[in-house]
Each structure stands twice: as structure tokens, then as C-alpha cells.
Regions:
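Class I SAM-dependent methyltransferase SAM/SAH-binding core
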Residues: 48-92
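A short acidic, Gly/Pro-enriched loop at the edge of an enzyme's catalytic core
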Residues: 91-103
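A short SAM/SAH-binding and catalytic strip from SAM-dependent methyltransferases
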Residues: 102-114
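Core SAM-dependent methyltransferase catalytic element
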Residues: 173-208
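Short alpha-helix
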Residues: 157-173
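A short glycine-rich, Lys/Arg-flanked "PGG" loop and its adjoining helix->strand segment in the class I
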Residues: 116-128
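Conserved class I S-adenosyl-L-methionine
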Residues: 1-34, 50-51, 133-155
Length: 208
């Protein structure tokens, strides 16, 4: 029986890299992600599959992914055969509580309620002390309004959540230690950490 680590080694040896060209945003997400060998990492959205492939080949971590596009899931499975990739709605991440050390979240056009549900699910599946790296547009309001007017998006989909609003949502859910890392002029990576209540209780006990 091949172990997870063995399957990653086999994949690197028998399925040569396509020398993927990661997008600027994907490179930004990977730059600020704190990932150790054998960590479990969740890629929410999957994109074109190149970031999941990069994680598997270069970070030696266990890669999982979820997207609400079945064709995207199928195509990404062809790139990263040892990753656990599933089809599910944005607000329904089908893994147990505290399953992941890190979650990488791509920019997506969800209304505020749907985004809050998605972030709540991210918080649920992250381990205490786990990291979220979230890609966000950071457009000035006039430019954002102009782009929204010309984009072909369904009527029920509103503008992207702003950085300030995302931080407020995350804080209410139990994230802390926020940092913002620009990626180009109008986008960036928002980093947040799930509050570690066990560590807090331990420190509180030491102080008493």
C-alpha cells in the first residue's frame, strides 16, 4: 500500500511538471502561506488547478480542493491525481471540523451572506491556530462601480466584498492577527489566523 507521502513522490516521478505559469494572485497567495511539510492544505476554488499542482510538487503537503464547478474539479484531478478534490457549493466544505492547517481562498463574486457562510465553513475546517490566506480585490469605490457596471454577472451577484468588510466578518467568526499584502495595484492577500483557544487558556492558567 502506498502512503500519502509515497503517492506524492510517485506523482512527481511519473507525471512530469508542465512548468505551470501561476497567476500573479496565486503567487501572492503562496508567498504568504505558512505551510510545513505534511500539512493539510485546502484550496478553495481551484482556479485552473495550477496552484494545487504547485503545492503538491513543491511544498510536499497534503492537498485538498473544493470547487462548485464539476468540470473544473475533473480537469484538476487530471493534474494532481493524489489530491483529494471534490465538487461542492461554496458554503459547504465537506470535511470534518479542524481538518486543515491552512486554507487558500481565491477571489469570488458572492453576495455578503454567501461570503459569510463560506468564511464560516473555512473557520470550521481550520485547526486552531490555522492560517487563512484570502485573495481580495482592493479597488477604489468609483472604479469598482464602473467595473461592476460592465461585467457580465448575474443580477443577484453583488460587488466583491471589500477588505474592511472581510476583516470584520473574520473577526466576528474568531480570526485574529490580520495582515494585508498588496498584489499589484488593485488586489492583495488578506492573512488571518484562527484564534487558538487552547493556547489562550494555557497562557491564562500560567498567569494566575
Amino acid at each position: 500500500m502506498i502512503s500519502k507521502a509515497g503517492s506524492r513522490t510517485y506523482e512527481r516521478a511519473h507525471f512530469p511538471s508542465r512548468h505551470p505559469r501561476l497567476s500573479t494572485m496565486e503567487r501572492c497567495l503562496l508567498k504568504w502561506a505558512v505551510i510545513d511539510r505534511d500539512d493539510r492544505v485546502l484550496d478553495v476554488g481551484l482556479g485552473n488547478g495550477l496552484m494545487a499542482e504547485y503545492l503538491l510538487r513543491n511544498m510536499e503537503c497534503e492537498v485538498c480542493g473544493v470547487a462548485d464547478d464539476m468540470e473544473l474539479v475533473r480537469s484538476t484531478r487530471g493534474l494532481v491525481r493524489s489530491a483529494d478534490l471534490v465538487y461542492a457549493a461554496a458554503g459547504d466544505i465537506p470535511w470534518r471540523d479542524q481538518a486543515f492547517h491552512a486554507v487558500l481562498l481565491r477571489p469570488c463574486r458572492l453576495d455578503e451572506s454567501a461570503m459569510e457562510n463560506q468564511l464560516r465553513e473555512v473557520h470550521r475546517v481550520l485547526k486552531e491556530g490555522g492560517q487563512l490566506v484570502m485573495a481580495l480585490e482592493n479597488l477604489p469605490a468609483p472604479l469598482r462601480s464602473a467595473l461592476d457596471a460592465i461585467r457580465e454577472t448575474p443580477a443577484e451577484v453583488t460587488e466583491n466584498i471589500t477588505r474592511r468588510r472581510a476583516m470584520k466578518m473574520l473577526s466576528q467568526l474568531g480570526f485574529e492577527q490580520f495582515s494585508w499584502h498588496p498584489c499589484g495595484i488593485f488586489a492583495g492577500a488578506l492573512v488571518a489566523w484562527k484564534r487558538n483557544t487552547v493556547e489562550e487558556r494555557f497562557k491564562k492558567g500560567e498567569g494566575e
